[in-house]
Amino acid sequence: MVASTMMSMGKDRTEVDISMIRHMILNSLRMYRQKYHEEYGELVLCCDGRNSWRREHFPLYKAGRKTTRDASSKDWTQIFGCLDTIKSELKEYFPYKYIEVEAAEADDVIGVLAKSWNEPIMIISSDKDFIQLQVKENVKQYSPITKKIVNDTNPERYLKEHILRGDSSDGIPNFLSADDCIVEKIRQAPITKKKVELWVDQEPEDFCNEEQLRNYHRNMKLIDLQYTPSNIVDQIGKQYDEIPKGKRSGLLNFFIERKLNNLIESIGEF
């Protein structure tokens, strides 16, 4: 939701219009439900909880995002407040399973559910982290940004390369580099394509020294979704088993109260 919200804002705008963002998010849910409901079943809304467990393992995880926000003129308190309001509305009024667990990210929720189910699953996300879940043939992914299916011919190999290279957008350095190199803007040790092609077919113990092996395991725990802590896995399962709070019979009143007039005519698609 944050990504779609930012895309809807002009460069000079410091706040968001909650009515516009609400309409945009709900219309997207309607559209994807119409497109995929018949083959993949009902929507499940997976949201980030606060205080990701990954920061306990790696305190610099996503640290650069806060730095970027602090340097921005946008009113992040107002923006996140609007998003929290909309998330609360989705949980309270809509007939979909809504999962948000303290210390878990949406990635954890999606990873746990994808591993638990054998029926067809469609993940709606542009995040390539989910390619690793495609080791199961029932898991597919659609990118709202490219409007294309996201896939890879070898998800296991993709995951290992991801661990080797790290993920600069999340503040995770490659396995040859120190923890703080991204935050401190220190150039990472280069990794060539030729080296990666050699390493992905080996065990890390075969090509890493002690420090590199430590960094490899650092990245593996942050990136590989099978490392979601067991207590979080249990909480995700419990929330999934709960009956949704919202009912379709209450949607009309919600749409009228929020002046979602353009969506009322499509209410049956929710």
Language-model segments: what does each one mean?
Residues 1-88:
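Domain-level signal for Mg2+-assisted phosphodiester chemistry and nucleotide/NA-binding surfaces
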Residues 10-12, 39-40, 67-254, 261-265, ...:
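Extended two-metal-dependent nuclease catalytic cores across DNA- and RNA-processing enzymes
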